[in-house]
């Protein structure tokens, strides 16, 4: 079908919106990295991004929604590991991807502390991020059960918590680097914990 003159303004508007959103999210990420979530303001984002405050408020109600948008944007790249025919490798792929995101230290630390103190953010985080990751781990666990690598009664939620929990604990409390060796240790521990008996 041929493009009409009426299609042009819509395309321009869509492109402008995408550029504005990219500038806003980029500025937000930079400001959180520099100042933490506590130092994030809509005024600061507007100044850094060059986008009007009214445009920002049209999309995000407040600083908390903007901070959550960063977390959603950061985790968007995570998706169900492909079927590799090897449950351990699929879980390792998931943990390595999660590690890459969590290693954005200052940003993640700031966002996690905000989530811990604000129930509405915690709820949104669970609904828009955790539940998605849980579904991805469930796909891997289901394949592992079908292969006989994991028992049929494997608790997906517990497996997910065991895969991701050590990453946050190390980042926030104990301090050693998150690296491939640690990812392997986490996955091996989970595989042993759920090994068919």
What are these regions (language model features)?
Residues 1-48, 54, 65:
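Basic, helix-initiating cap at the start of DNA-binding domains
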Residues 1-11, 89, 93, 100, ...:
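C-terminal peripheral helix-coil segments that are non-catalytic and often amphipathic
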């Amino acid at each position: 079908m041929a493009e009409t003159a009426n299609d042009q303004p819509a395309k321009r508007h869509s492109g402008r919106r995408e550029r504005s959103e990219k500038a806003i999210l980029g500025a937000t990420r930079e400001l959180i990295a520099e100042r933490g979530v506590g130092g994030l303001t809509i005024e600061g984002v507007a100044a850094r991004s060059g986008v009007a405050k009214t445009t920002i408020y049209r999309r995000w109600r407040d600083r908390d929604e903007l901070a959550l948008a960063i977390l959603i944007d950061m985790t968007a790249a995570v998706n169900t590991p492909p079927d590799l025919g090897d449950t351990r490798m699929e879980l390792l792929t998931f943990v390595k991807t999660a590690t890459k995101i969590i290693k954005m230290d200052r940003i993640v630390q700031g966002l996690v502390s905000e989530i811990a103190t604000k129930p509405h953010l915690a709820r949104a985080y669970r609904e828009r991020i955790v539940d998605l990751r849980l579904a991805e781990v469930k796909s891997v666990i289901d394949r592992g059960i079908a292969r006989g690598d994991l028992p049929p009664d494997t608790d997906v939620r517990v497996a997910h918590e065991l895969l991701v929990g050590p990453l946050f604990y190390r980042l926030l409390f104990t301090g050693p680097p998150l690296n491939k060796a640690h990812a392997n240790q986490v996955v091996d521990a989970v595989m042993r914990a759920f090994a068919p008996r």
